[in-house]
Amino acid sequence: PAAEHFSIVDADGNVIPWQKSADGRLVFFAKGVPAKGYKTFSIVHGGEQGENTVKVENKTIENKFFTVKFDKDMNIASLIHKATGRAVAPEGEVLNKIYAYDDRPFNHEAWDIKVYFDQKYTEINDVSAVDVTESGPVRTVIKVTRKFLSSTIDQSFIFYADLPRIDVDYTVDWKEKKILLKADFPVDVNATEATYD
């Protein structure tokens, strides 16, 4: 739709919050789509996008699920799960710390990672830009740009209004050789099984 005076509604007539993404796409939370099924949504004239419920203040981001505080290097210094009041990171640890490791394989360039790879490393803390690239009723996106030697690392932290999760999307323009990159998220979870990607 060319004009932004429209609404998205589901088959039951419920109005669904929406917003434009940083790259101009229409974004909304498709609630209630059955597994292996579908649900129809329609664009109708009139109405508004909805209100932003994700708060950004200084280096603190808050929605109804989490309170997140960033440190001076834009690493996550504190992530509190509001429903339980529990800190996700272990005491004294930060989430999202990026490391560059010396990568000197014996035989093969790709995936020949030796057990001692973590003995020589550099923390990547050179933040060159922090921008709020999206702020709307569906999500808020904080983009952090880091520099390392000749490379650039863009991290987009995505905080949703109605989803109990935080996504971190990486875009890396990597120009280095024999250097391994790692993002560290030490979480304080005591479980015999975990599902993650």
PLM regions: where:
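Polysaccharide-binding surfaces and accessory modules of carbohydrate-active proteins
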Residues: F185-D197
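Catalytic and substrate-binding regions of extracellular carbohydrate-active enzymes
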Residues: P1-V172, A183
